[in-house]
Amino acid sequence: MNNLTSRALELQRLAHELIYLGVDGEPIYSDTFCRLNKDVLLQCDSLFLLRGSTSDEEANLCLALLLGYNATIYDYGNKERNKQSVLDRAFEVLEQLPASLLKVRLLTYC
């Protein structure tokens, strides 16, 4: 697994953790919530300008970015524009993907 794929999968994991924070009945601490929001948004912004070298890699990256941007509460003024750009990229890559779980997951978030 290359570096971009591992970074995208890590962002997916963090965004999932943020989305489901507290669902297990555990208390939500504000410092944990704020740290996760900041970490997810910083990772999104660091991956935003990158492109996958294959359609699967690009799809995983788009999925991670959509998960991350939708999970965070922070916005420094460019989040909606970035989300639209990722959606445009996702629609381009969806046409190239074969039927797969990755394609279904990406369609779900589009």
Model-predicted segments: where are they?
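Small-residue hotspots
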Residues: 8, 15, 83, 90-93
